[in-house]
């Protein structure tokens, strides 16, 4: 059991060591490359890839007609954030 805990700790530390930081909610690093259908985003000071559409929007409910979406295996809904429809789950 201790081997599993040690392995999990090593994976977490490895991820934090090579994580790309962001400032003021903006991820400008070229080190993070997101797959098609994803855009760079900043969460808790780290750059992440967020599921997004190419559809622009102006208010939160502009994206609700897109229906449900999936992010990291969890179902969510589209919301307008930073003028782009992004997938969020709550």
From Swiss-Prot:
Transmembrane segments: none
Compartment list: Secreted
Post-translational modifications reported in the UniProt record: Contains 6 disulfide bonds.
Main location: secreted
GO cellular component, one term: extracellular space
Molecular function per GO: serine-type endopeptidase inhibitor activity
Tissue expression pattern: Detected in hemolymph (at protein level). In oysters collected in the summer the expression level is highest in the digestive gland with low levels of expression in gill, mantle, labial palp, style-sac midgut, gonad, heart, and hemocyte. In winter expression levels are higher in all tissues with highest expression levels observed in the digestive gland. Within the digestive gland expression is limited to the basophil cells of the digestive diverticula.
Domain of life: Eukaryota
Secretion signal span: 1-19
Parts forming coiled coils: none
Record's keyword terms, sorted: Antimicrobial, Disulfide bond, Protease inhibitor, Secreted, Serine protease inhibitor, Signal
Keyword NAD in record: no
Task of the protein: Slow-binding inhibitor of serine proteases. The inhibitor rapidly binds to the protease forming a weak enzyme-inhibitor complex, and this is followed by a slow isomerization forming a tight-binding enzyme-inhibitor complex. Active against subtilisin A, perkinsin and trypsin with dissociation constants of 0.29 nM, 13.7 nM and 17.7 nM respectively. Not active against thermolysin, papain or pepsin. Has antiparasitic activity against the protozoan P.marinus.
Protein name, per record: Serine protease inhibitor Cvsi-1
Organism whose genome encodes this protein: Crassostrea virginica
């Amino acid at each position: 059991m201790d081997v599993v805990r040690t392995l999990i700790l090593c994976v977490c530390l490895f991820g934090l060591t090579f994580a790309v930081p962001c400032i003021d909610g903006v991820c400008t690093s070229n080190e993070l490359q997101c797959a098609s259908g994803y855009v760079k985003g900043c969460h808790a000071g780290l750059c992440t890839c967020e599921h997004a559409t190419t559809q622009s929007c102006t208010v939160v409910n502009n994206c609700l007609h897109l229906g449900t979406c999936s992010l990291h295996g969890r179902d969510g809904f589209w919301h307008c954030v930073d003028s782009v429809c992004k997938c969020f789950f709550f």
